[in-house]
Structures are given as structure tokens and as C-alpha cells.
Amino acid sequence: LNVSFLGVYSACASFISSIIILANSISGKLIKEGLAFTSSHNLCSEKQFRFPVEYGALKPIYSTFTCTGSVGCNVSKYPSRIKVISSTIGSVVDYGIKDANNMGAVMAPSAVDTLIKHLEYTNTKVNDYDLILTGDLGLYGADLFKMILKKDYGINIRNYIDSGSIIYNKEQEKYSGGSGPVCLPLVLFNNILNNKRYKKIIVIGTGSLHCPTLVNQKKSIPSTSHLISLEVE
């Protein structure tokens, strides 16, 4: 295809990174529109970052199950009912977690850090939004996200959903929930944006910046989270 291509990788925050790049390129009049894609596959992720499924390694209850799927969207200068209003690129945060199965604990601190920075930059409060949506913290990571907000910043968040926590139903028994770059956009486009209750939405992509070498060396796992603010007509 004779179309400009840019490969983006921010772990499970990659899709939000793509949206930020496209939206800012359009705002700067560099392009008129662009396509953002992301995908993930359970077996590939397990083999690359943890253990092959055939190995039969046991997983702790706080681990997550990588989603298999693919999502694409068009970001354009032309008007539509969904608008990207603002964005915040997150910093790298490291809380010293070394367990590659405990991605929720790895990513929750960076999600909080990015959210707080965005609220400060935009002079807004959590209650100014209808929903705060995170990517793939899972059940335990989502609880940690809320706990840090309350303990460190005095914010008792109620308008909050984690994509990984709701993408699977209880009968599927997928540990702490879903994960992977595609987890957030699957929930965002198939569920959240079709719900007319949500007009102003903060979407936080959460990414764990680890690799097998880092884990095998018993190094701590850093993370980063990127954020976009959407308005839906």
C-alpha cells in the first residue's frame, strides 16, 4: 500500500498512543485523517512474555488472560459524534513490582499518575466526567487503582470501569480479567461508546514495559499509561 505507515509500541497502551499521534497530527494540519489499528493474541503473548501454554505452568489468581482480537478506527478532521478533546502522555513509573503475572499492580500506579497529571493540566475533576475507563488492570489492579487515588490524593472514584475487569463474564473464569493491547478498544467501541449515558469519557491505556530478559534478571517492571479525553454527542 502506498500509504505512510508508523509502527507504535507502548505495550498495552499502544492503541491510545496511536490515537494521540493521529489526533495531534490532524490538529497540527499535518494530515487530514488516519487509521489506528491494534491487535493481540493470547497464545503469542503467553509464549513471548511468560510460558507457552503447552508447558502447563500454573497461574496465580491475580494474573490476567490476554485477549485475542483486532480493532481499527478512523481518526479524521471531519466532524463525527465522537471527538478527541485532549490527551496526556504518561511518564514511566516503577513501583518495584517484579512479578510478571501481576500486571495490575505494575500498571495501576502509572494509571493514577497520568490521570492526576491530566486533571491538573486541564483544571478538571474526576466528577466532571461521566466515566473513567482504564485498559487492563484486571480486578485486583482496578482495586489498587482506586486505593491509590483515595489514599494518596483523597479521591473516592465512583464513575470508573476497567476494561479488563468486564470483558469476560464470570462463567469464563479468566483469572483477574482480560489484558492485551486490544482489550481496551474492544470494550470502548463495542460497549462504552454505544451506551448513551457516557458523554464525557477519560480513556487510559495502561502498558507494562517488561520483557523476558528483564523478568529473568529479577528486575522490577516499569509501566506507562497514556490518556485521551472523549466527548460523545
Regions found by a protein language model. Name each.
Residues 1-31, 40, 45-47, 78, ...:
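Claisen-condensing/thiolase-fold acyl-transfer catalytic domains that form or cleave C-C bonds
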Residues 52-117, 121-124, 155-166, 198-206, ...:
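Condensing-enzyme catalytic core mediating Claisen C-C bond formation in acyl metabolism
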